[in-house]
Design a protein with these regions (language model features):
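Charged, alpha-helix-forming regions
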Residues: 1-243
Length: 243
């Protein structure tokens, strides 16, 4: 019961931090009417990916950028032995199809190197046309789960974003120095959230192991009258606390 309560508490903390991040990201990227607006088609090129089902290989050279890869921030990977639709440094990949109320629709991934990634079907690829007008990382933050695209999810049917649905959305274009400042702020906030994503699950696992250890100690003592010998690591940990 105790470990379940701790897990629930830490999971709730993680969820709250994610919600807080989304709130502030939306707030930072909301502009008044004085800021110029351009359509996405005016600031970025677009292409659709290709099917890689026949080219999947465990030891393939290329990472297939599909919806699972993007929705897990690159944690779930499939490889291909062919680069059917190459992606390049600073390309932005976006999920164009998802289940009703899915968390992947319009989620984006920023490509960090050449000759490594290949774009799968139903994933859109974007590249900024002019960095003097729109900074790539700023555009990434604008596009990622953009509310203008999420409105196509009716909560009942599979959502399939069309090319024009995407290219017609409005992109606020503040001054370049403002874009860079926003990127700096969002990068830092994103890093904090990423640390939480790593730290809190690790804390849950540590608490679970701690609970299991003391449970085994108590059960062994109840059954045999003996106490489980501590491991060197546990002894070191207790010694550190007293030093």
């Amino acid at each position: 019961l105790l470990t379940a309560e701790l897990t629930a508490e830490l999971t709730a903390e993680l969820t709250a931090r994610k919600s807080q991040y989304e709130f502030y990201r939306r707030k930072l990227l909301t502009f008044d009417e004085s800021i110029p607006q351009l359509q996405l088609r005016d600031v970025a090129s677009f292409r659709n990916g290709k099917g890689h089902e026949k080219n999947i290989a465990d030891n393939g050279k290329y990472v297939v950028v599909n919806s699972k890869f993007i929705s897990t921030n690159g944690q779930v990977i499939k490889n291909s032995d062919e680069q059917l639709s190459p992606l390049y440094f600073d390309d932005i990949a976006m999920v164009m199809s998802d289940l009703p109320n899915g968390r992947a629709l319009a989620k984006c991934y920023l490509i960090d190197k050449d000759d490594k990634f290949t774009l799968n079907q139903r994933i859109g690829g974007f590249h900024t046309l002019d960095e003097n007008i729109v900074v790539t990382k700023y555009l990434f933050y604008i596009l990622d789960r953009n509310w203008q695209l999420l409105k196509y999810d009716n909560g009942v049917d599979q959502t399939n974003l069309k090319k024009d649905d995407i290219l017609n959305i409005s992109i606020p274009v503040p001054a370049i120095d403002v874009q860079k400042r926003l990127v700096y702020m969002l990068d830092n906030f994103d890093a904090i959230c990423s640390d939480l994503n790593i730290g809190l699950p690790a804390e849950i696992e540590a608490r679970q192991k701690q609970y299991e250890y003391y449970r085994d100690v108590l059960l062994t003592y109840a059954a045999t009258g003996k106490i489980i010998a501590q491991t060197d690591r546990q002894t070191d940990r207790q010694t550190d606390k007293h030093n």
